[in-house]
Amino acid sequence: MEQLIHYVWKHKLFPLTGLKTTDGKPVEVIDPGLHNHNAGPDFFNAKVKIDGTLWVGNVEIHDRSSDWFLHHHEQDANYNNVILHVAESIDADVRTEQGDYPPQMQLNVPVKIREHYDELITTDNYPACYCIIPDLPKLMIHAWMSALQVERLEQKTDAITERLTACNGSWEAAYFVTLARNYGFGINGDAFETWAKMVPLQSVDHHRDDIMQIEAIFLGQAGLLELPAIPERYQQEAAKDEYFIRLQQEYRYLAHKFGLHKMDAHQWRFLRLRPQNFPHIRIAQLAHLYYQRHAGLSQLLECETVKQAKELLATQVTPYWETHYMFGAESEKNEKHLSTSSLNLLVINTVVPMLFAYGRHKGSERLCNRAFDFLEALKAENNHIVRMWKEVGLAVETAGDSQALIQLKKTYCDKKDCLRCRIGYEYLKKKDA
C-alpha cells in the first residue's frame, strides 16, 4: 500500500542503516523532506547521501517501481529533479523526461508496522486504538486534542463562509442560517438550513414588532401553513383553528407583498421526534427569538460569557404554542423553553463557530479567543462518542474535548485514516506485550 510506504518514509520508521540503492551504493536518509499532497513528487527538499555525496531534491515513492511509467512521470518535467525513487518492489528501471535515470532504493514496510496497521484497519472495535490510550503521554493527548479542536472550528468556519457566499455577503443572514440549522438538532438540520435560506430576513425586519406576522412568514415559508402538511388525524381540527386560519391569511398577504415562495413541507421529518422537537415548535421558538430583533448577530458578538450567550438564545413561544405541538393538536400547557442541554448545544454549534468565523474575518484575536474560552467553560457533551472514549480511559471534561473527539471520529476514525492521526502514529510504532 503506497500510503503506508509514504508514512514509513515520512516518519523514518525503518532501519536507518544498511540502506542501499539497487546498484549497491550506500544510502543515508538525513531528511525525508516535506510531504507534498498536491501534483508533483511526493516529498520536496529531501536530503539524502548516496555513496557519500549529499543530494538535496525531491523523492518519489511507489508500491512498484514500474508505477513510475503507469503515472507517466517519464513525460512530466516536474520529476526531473527526483534524487531518489523509493519503492517496495523494484521491477523496472525508471527515467525522467530529460532522459536521466534516478537512483532507486527498495524500502520494505517493517513487518510489525504492517501488522499494527492491519489491526487498525480491519478491527470492528471503536476506537480501534483503545488498548494504548492509558499509556499515552498526557502532553501528547492534550496537543492532539487542541489541534483537533482548531480543525473542527476551521471546518465549521468553512461551512459558514459558504453560507456567507450564498447569502450575498450578509453576515446576519449567514448567522441566521447557521442558527436555524442547529435548531434542527441533527435530524432536521438540512431542512432547517433549506428553510432559513428561503426566509427573507430584511422583510422580517419590517415586521419585527408583530410576532404573528413573523410566525406567519416563518411557518409559511416552511410550508407548514398548508392542510396537507398536517397529519390527517388533525386536519379537521386545524381547518377550524382560528390561530391557524389567521396565520394563513397573514402569510398569503405577506407572500404576495414580498413575492415569497415556500419550501416543500415533505422535507420535514417527524418520525421518532419528541413533540417538543417538532418543526412547528422549533420555528415558533425562532420566531420569538427574532421578535423585536432580540437575538441578531450584533447582540451575539456582544456576549462576553457563556451565561450571556445562553440568555440571548433562551426563548419562549406564544400562548398558542404553549398548548399545541402542531395545528389542531391541543396538549397540556407547557411553556416550551429550550432545555439547558439544548442551549449548550446551540452555544457549541452556533455561537462558538460564529465568533471564530467572524473573528477570523475581522482579524479579531479577541473574538477567536472568546470562542475557545466558551468551549472550555462548557462541560463536555454527553453522546456515544464521548462515552466510548471515556470507557477506554481518556479524560473528557470540556466541550472543547468533546468537539475534538467528534472531529477525530468523523474525520479520521470513520474513514480509517489512522495514518494522519497522532494516536494512530503511536499505535503503529508500539511495542507488543
Residue positions per predicted region:
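N-terminal "leader" segments that precede or initiate the main folded domain
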Residues: 1-7
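N-terminal ordered "arm"
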Residues: 7-66, 79
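Catalytic micro-motifs at enzyme active sites that drive phosphoryl/nucleotidyl and oxygen chemistry
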Residues: 32-37, 45-50, 68-75, 90-96, ...
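An acidic- and aromatic-residue-enriched active-site/binding cleft used to recognize and process polar
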Residues: 62-66, 89, 110, 426
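Mg2+/Mn2+-dependent nuclease catalytic core
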Residues: 64-86
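Compact, glycine/acidic-enriched structural inserts
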Residues: 80-82, 86-144
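Hydrophobic, aromatic-lined core segments that form the binding pocket/scaffold
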Residues: 149-404, 417
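Acidic, carboxylate-rich catalytic segments that either coordinate divalent cations
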Residues: 391-433
